[in-house]
Amino acid sequence: MRKKVLITGFDPFDKETVNPSWEAAKRLNGFETEEAIITAEQIPTVFRSALDTLRQAIQKHQPDIVICVGQAGGRMQITPERVAINLADARIPDNEGHQPIDEEISPDGPAAYWTRLPVKRMTAKMKEHGIPAAVSYTAGTFVCNYLFYGLMDHISRTSPHIRGGFIHIPYIPQQTIDKTAPSLSLDTIVRALRIAAVTAAQYDEDVKSPGGTLH
């Protein structure tokens, strides 16, 4: 039975004119394989409404799997995230000027949630297709981590049958014309997210393989 996969991306923030997470996600809207049917929704880069928008999308689409995607300018690889932390600590304001500092996302929630996606399998599959990828162990403390933590808190409390997680992606080339920062083509990012969605639909459990970081 094919799995319904919801992929989300953010609108542009921090003076950018595009956000590759949404540019990639919307290309996958309506994509179907033997394993998965993908729908896409845009999320505002706003602490107060990001999670509300995601909850509405989950209610609308009734997915089996949720993959939230965000821009991580400066990263060189596609990075599926392993853990979300219960902290909002914004270096810059969000798109409505909110800048929470040292605030808990959920006062009665745990310190962290693990992803429910097979991130090591996803990373390995991307590499098999020539796409630079690595498991990440920090999703930051801005709206990306806020949404990731909020997603996991929501499904843990209300929809334990849903598997969810987060993937960070690099800039696309048009964003780096005036920056000394790495980028990946939008086509490559779209391929990576398609591989991630199909892999998540195929495998409920992750593989035990060497990973982690030394620092």
Curated annotation (Swiss-Prot):
Stored PANTHER family: PROTEASE FAMILY C15 PYROGLUTAMYL-PEPTIDASE I-RELATED (PTHR23402), PYROGLUTAMYL-PEPTIDASE I (PTHR23402:SF1)
Statement: the UniProt record of this protein carries the keyword Cytoplasm: yes
Described purpose of this protein according to its UniProt entry: Removes 5-oxoproline from various penultimate amino acid residues except L-proline.
Protein's name according to its UniProt entry: Pyrrolidone-carboxylate peptidase
InterPro entries named in the record: Peptidase_C15, Peptidase_C15-like, Peptidase_C15-like_sf, PGP-I_bact-type, PGPEP1_Cys_AS, PGPEP1_Glu_AS
Catalytic activity annotation: Release of an N-terminal pyroglutamyl group from a polypeptide, the second amino acid generally not being Pro
Broad enzyme group: hydrolase
Compartments where located: Cytoplasm
Family stated for the protein in its record: Belongs to the peptidase C15 family.
EC number: 3.4.19.3
